[in-house]
Amino acid sequence: MDTKAFKRSLQQSENYHRKGFGQEDEAMGVMNSEYQSSLIQEIRNNNYRLTQGDVTIRLAEAFGFCWGVERAVAMSYETRQHFPNQRIWLTNEVIHNPSVNQRLRDMKVEFIPVIEDQKDFSVVERDDVVILPAFGASVTEMQLLNDKGCTIVDTTCPWVAKVWNSVEKHKKRNYTSIIHGKYKHEETVATSSFAGTYLVVLNMEQAKYVCNYILNGGDKQEFLAKFKKAYSEGFDPDTDLERVGIANQTTMLKSETEEIGKLFEHTMLKKYGPLDLNNHFMSFNTICDATQERQDAMLDLVKEKLDLMVVIGGFNSSNTTHLQEISIHHGIVSYHIDSAARIDLNNHIEHKPLGKDLEVKENWLPDGKIVVGVTSGASTPDIVVEQVLQKIFAIKSAVAMV
């Protein structure tokens, strides 16, 4: 289908809203009172460091709520204010942060139920309001909601929409979209729905496999089995990898996205030569500024002399996971938690090691003076970071008094 024409038609509908309802200041005031932190602002003003007792905190210089997340949450608050008596639904978590999503539930914003891995949109009625989250929604979902005639509030991050425009350009020129991302992630599901032919690659290892296939061929059935559920219907690696364009899930590791883009460019250059490269490869510029800033800040932070790192964000948050990867790659003991509730005052922490299930670590804060690096994902409010720091200070203070 012509997804570009559908988007244009949807945006002209009187039931579609993507710019709020004129109550932005009120919504932001409520948000600021709930999510901002005077302590975190104090640390920012003090060159991103604070020493209290035996603990020195080193904050990353870019962390926490990004503009797209702040916008999505503010629009959700504003929607509740503007429609105080109507039933409001979210098609997914508005962002990947448990406390923010719980706050919306407390405001009687409901989530579309999921039955056997499928969303049940039958619960939505014409008079209802449906919020599309920061990650966006698939074309199919938007069509369904538009057909129902309900009110649609679109909080999709503009950076995500920029990626949609890129894959639509690929489709228009008959290029296959190579999407660096997680094929099940809400954002990638939405992005792939705007693409024509596409293939989702998770990492450099998968990208190298694809590029080797482009140059040398291989077992098609093995290829299709390896990327099961990660390609468009009818995808054929023997014919659909002759012309490719690169796109990405905006929260992926910036350096890896760039490396994957260069790998595909070099692969097509090797196969088709410099004079014909532009007929087989489309370059890209879809790396989110906020993701890049947070990853760059983390790369600066790991250069400090740290005893350990605390990474705060939802366990299903892709951008938070990549911050954790950077810390581990640089040999720093790192703990990924989603809230201060994961820390108890007996010096235990329940955390999620990279690629593993939750586990509990006892005596995670060492004795004596320590320097703790701290960062948080783009969906984590400052107040959550403060709550984590207060737990750390309390544990070390109690130990010092023994």
Curated annotation (Swiss-Prot):
The active site is at E187 (proton donor). It is an enzyme of class 1 (oxidoreductase). It comes from Gloeothece citriformis (strain PCC 7424). The gene is ispH. (2E)-4-hydroxy-3-methylbut-2-enyl diphosphate binds at H96, H185, T250, S317, S318, N319, S379. NCBIfam families: ispH_lytB, PRK13371.1. Catalyzes the conversion of 1-hydroxy-2-methyl-2-(E)-butenyl 4-diphosphate (HMBPP) into a mixture of isopentenyl diphosphate (IPP) and dimethylallyl diphosphate (DMAPP). Acts in the terminal step of the DOXP/MEP pathway for isoprenoid precursor biosynthesis. This is 4-hydroxy-3-methylbut-2-enyl diphosphate reductase. Binds 1 [4Fe-4S] cluster per subunit.
